[in-house]
Amino acid sequence: MQRANHSTVTQFILVGFSVFPHLQLMLFLLFLLMYLFTLLGNLLIMATVWSERSLHTPMYLFLCALSVSEILYTVAIIPRMLADLLSTQRSIAFLACASQMFFSFSFGFTHSFLLTVMGYDRYVAICHPLRYNVLMSPRGCACLVGCSWAGGLVMGMVVTSAIFHLAFCGHKEIHHFACHVPPLLKLACGDDVLVVAKGVGLVCITALLGCFLLILLSYAFIVAAILKIPSAEGRNKAFSTCASHLTVVVVHYGFASVIYLKPKSPQSLEGDTLMGITYTVLTPFLSPIIFSLRNKELKVAMKKTFFSKLYPEKNVMM
């Protein structure tokens, strides 16, 4: 019977935006601008690194990989979300829902793994500068990036296959703006729902907490090494190479902890939806801004690469 019920569910209905119908046009315009800025900002970072030879280093290779993961993550969720804001028909096919979950989880976890790799890169650069070229060889960097992407794809496959092997009984309304795990679990039925929920939660928490602890460990060694530098100028210079990455980590895990660790309440549907949207849209939106403004080397390269071409007469005067 469970498999029969499962086979009858051919589509779901996303009702996350129905809690504030009067704001949908304003939200559409706001999210569209943020989405376009996210794409443009990350493409600008990638183009700058590609065109500026001085940025052909492991740190900026990882930054480009991070930009790719952010572009793909937003593309997996936001275009569909924008279409739903303008439509009264918010149904999504079963396979489309599974695909959205797979790609969003894959690129989301890839993003977390790459942030961990970037923390390790900064640890090697500051704590073992003489061995940096050996430890961060081109082959080693490619391996770290490849493992991050492979790990993200494996996580996406594990979570998606676990959720969509469940039986769904009758109800089709997903109280979210995307195909997300908690609202889909509420639609599932059968004796294995609780086991799957605990298993998926354990896998996701273990992966994210492991990444966070590795980043904390890297920065513990980094801070200890920076404090041993005798001059204030040297300490500031060393810390400046980590500032943008550390800020993105705080934003990424800060928003995630507020959303996923806060107590759930049946009366907080609007708040949960808004916080979920904030994490999905605002975090990728802020990331290129942080890296562009807080990374002096990247900021100078952007001005040299693009500003000088747009305003050559000002470049001559400089």
From Swiss-Prot:
UniProt xrefs under Pfam families: 7tm_4 (PF13853)
Transmembrane domains' residue ranges: 26-46, 55-75, 100-120, 140-160, 198-218, 239-259, 273-293
Subcellular location: Cell membrane
Residue ranges, Cytoplasmic side: 47-54, 121-139, 219-238, 294-318
UniProt entry keywords in alphabetical sequence: Cell membrane, Disulfide bond, G-protein coupled receptor, Glycoprotein, Membrane, Olfaction, Receptor, Sensory transduction, Transducer, Transmembrane, Transmembrane helix
Topological domain spans for side Extracellular: 1-25, 76-99, 161-197, 260-272
InterPro entries registered for this protein in UniProt: GPCR_Rhodpsn, GPCR_Rhodpsn_7TM, Olfact_rcpt
Disulfide linkage: 97-189
Membrane topology of the entry: Multi-pass membrane protein
Sites where a glycan is attached: 5
Gene Ontology terms describing biological process: detection of chemical stimulus involved in sensory perception of smell
Name of the protein in question: Olfactory receptor 10H1
